[in-house]
Structure formats: structure tokens, C-alpha cells
Amino acid sequence: MNPAGTVPTLVHGKRVLTESTPMCEYIDAVFDGPKLMPADPAARYRVREWCRRTDMAAAALSVLGWHSFLGPMLKQKSEEELDRLIARIPLKERRIAWSAAAKSTFTEEQLDDARAKVGAWAAEMNRQLARTPYLAGETYTLADLVAFANFWGLPRTVPEYANAERTPHYLSWLRHMHARPASIRLFQASRSLGQMALGLGAELQEAA
């Protein structure tokens, strides 16, 4: 259903939505509940700017995710199963990425570059969170939700960059985000990654 061969995909009535961040804004606008997009145009711009920057930063994180999580999972499949799975992906660059993850063809230079880029983004979030309690200002918005969805695990993924000494404000925000009831319900409903997230959340609370 998604021409890019990625997830998520949302079907709502006759609409098919395939871009995750615009999808979040659509859900916020269409469904009932506390609104995550501010009414003020300037404030709304700041939220969208942070969402866009988060999406761009997530590209480096995906390399680490493919290497650490997707690769080991795909290695459990036979070569024939893997070839069939990859052949179903419509975009060539996504097929190449999945193949690289499955065969562990990321070089140490590529992995180090990805870690450095993710670490730079952690530092950028930390600088903003030193000024305001949330990424786009004084209130919780879609910017925080999108950033947390992508970067909830940096103390585990890049501990050399995301730690109490280098990014204390990011860790304080992360602790708050992990403790939100919606986050806990989501992770409890998830499988292995959910359990990992719950464990990290508990560690953050203990370290507070």
C-alpha cells in the first residue's frame, strides 16, 4: 500500500496516508483529544520546523537501527525467504538498504559517521531543551511526539553522546517522555522494543 515500501501506512475511510509525520498531524486534526498543533501560526511553524529537522536526523539513526535490530532479525530467515522479502520492496534504494542490513555490509566508517550524526542531533535537542521545557516551546506538541518516537533510545544507541554529562537537558526531557502514561501504554503493547523501552524508562527514573 505504501509506494515507498516503508511503514507506517494509515487507511482512514477512502484516504491512504503514507508519510508518518504528516500522518500524525492529520490524526491530531481529525480525531478528538488534546491538540498537539498550536493555533498560533508562528508556534505552528516552530512545531513543523522541529518535525522536519527530526525527520532529517532520523536518516542516520535508521542506519544504526538496521545494523543493530533489523539485520539480526533478517539473518534468521533463509536466503530464499530474504530474497522474496526484499524483491517485494518497490524502491531500489530501500531494497539496497535492506540487503545491506541483512548481510551486515555497513562499514565501520559508515556506522561511526551515523553515530556522530545522531550524537550531533542529541546535542542540538539538548541546546533547545536548555532554553525551553519542550522542543517547540513551553508546551508539549507534535514536535516532542515525533522526536520521542525516533530518539527514545539514544542512551542505549549512542551512550557516548547521550549521557548525563553531555546532554542533561535531553535526558530530563527523555525521562519525562518515557513516564507519560501514553508512552507506557504503547511500550507495554509492543514486543521486544517495547520491553527495551520500558527498561530504559525505569533506568532513567532511577537515575533522576
Regions found by a protein language model. Give the residues of each.
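GST-like domain detector, emphasizing the conserved glutathione-binding G-site
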Residues: 1-91, 105, 204, 208
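GST-like fold's C-terminal all-alpha helical module
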Residues: 58-175
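Short, thiol/selenol-centered motifs that function as redox-active sites or metal-ligating centers
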Residues: 47, 144-145, 180
